[in-house]
Regions:
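Internal catalytic-core helix/loop-beta-alpha segment
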Residues: 182-243
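Internal, well-ordered interaction modules that form the hydrophobic cores of assembly/scaffold domains
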Residues: 114, 127-130, 137-143, 219-233
Length: 319
């Protein structure tokens, strides 16, 4: 009598039939390669039939996954910000060949920007932004006018109503530099090169300072350094010239802004008896510094920069 046990072993004939059906079903599957006209060779068929396709597909999938990851990473990575570089220092000695002057004015005041803005670099002009107050104030204090002061629509900037000189006193940029330096003033920047997206001092990264200490060693008549752009510039000056402060050669200016910015860095000897140069934190000339009006900024610069500087120039000429 035949056994009714469901766990009984399959007969060889039934097993062979099952294998044949499975093979037929597999043969009926049309792969994408076959639909595109690719007919696998016997070797390829044998390779796939043994299950090696699983590891092959896995490796391929992992490879493409890594490539996709690389593409995604490179496409989302922020573009590198190019380094920008400051101008060379400008003083009367650097202008003499252009002007034909026979005598060189000694430098008594070195005015430092932080680093040229996009507008300055594109125009190759220090303090080149049209609404930067620097050249407007220099003109008011030294007897010239920067330009007409009109915007793209032909309307005058607000600050032009406070200017001391009319259109007949407008000078070109080169002539402004010539007059400015002939009075013993010099221009440079704190930062020689840096990475910065935009023009804000706060966005400066990986900076390298200019050789300002060496400049002053070469110009022993320098009596004051003026930081033209406020707080961030002062912070960078302190960071890069801490040893200069510790040497005792520098002292804070007499205004409140300078004392606040520099007192803790200065070497306090007997009333700064060894100090040769005062460092002034000035009201910022930047158009972004809107806390003070143009008139307030000009008054500060006249009291602490141009007034004392012109007196020093007269004294130096008498030597």
């Amino acid at each position: 009598m035949a056994s009714s046990n469901p766990l009984r072993r399959s007969s060889p004939r039934r097993k062979a039939t099952s294998v044949a059906v499975t093979a037929a079903a597999a043969a009926a599957i049309v792969t994408p390669q076959q639909s595109a006209g690719f007919v696998p060779s016997p070797v390829t068929s044998r390779y796939f039939s043994k299950g090696a396709n699983t590891s092959k597909a896995s490796r391929s999938s992992r490879l493409f996954s890594e490539r996709d990851k690389e593409v995604t990473t490179s496409s989302t990575k922020k573009p590198k910000v190019e380094r920008t570089h400051s101008f060379q220092p400008v003083w009367h000695g650097s202008m003499v060949k252009k002007s034909g002057d026979s005598e060189v004015a000694d430098v008594h005041t070195l005015v430092l920007g932080t680093h040229p803005s996009i507008a300055s670099l594109s125009k190759s002009e220090m303090f080149g932004h049209t609404q930067n107050a620097f050249w407007w104030m220099a003109g008011d204090c030294l007897g010239f006018r920067r330009q007409l002061g009109l915007n793209a629509e032909g309307k005058p900037y607000k600050l032009t109503q406070y200017l001391r000189y009319d259109e007949s006193h407008v000078l070109s940029y080169e002539d402004q530099l010539q007059l400015f330096t002939s009075k013993g003033f010099a221009l440079w920047d704190i930062i020689k090169s840096c990475e910065r997206k935009g023009s804000l001092d706060a966005d400066i990264k990986n900076e390298e300072p200019n050789e300002i200490w060496d400049f002053c060693k070469s110009h022993k008549t320098v009596k004051r350094i003026v930081l033209a752009n406020g707080g961030t510039g002062c912070t960078m000056f302190n960071r890069h010239f801490r040893d200069w402060w510790l040497s005792g050669e520098l002292k804070p200016g007499s205004n409140a802004e300078s004392k606040k910015a520099f007192d803790k860095f200065a070497k306090k000897t007997d009333n700064f008896r060894d100090a040769k140069i005062e460092v002034i934190s000035a009201l910022s000339v930047s158009p972004a510094a809107a806390k003070y009006s143009y008139e307030e900024k000009r008054q500060f610069w006249e009291d602490y920069v141009y007034g004392p500087g012109l007196k020093d120039h007269e004294e130096l000429q008498k030597r």
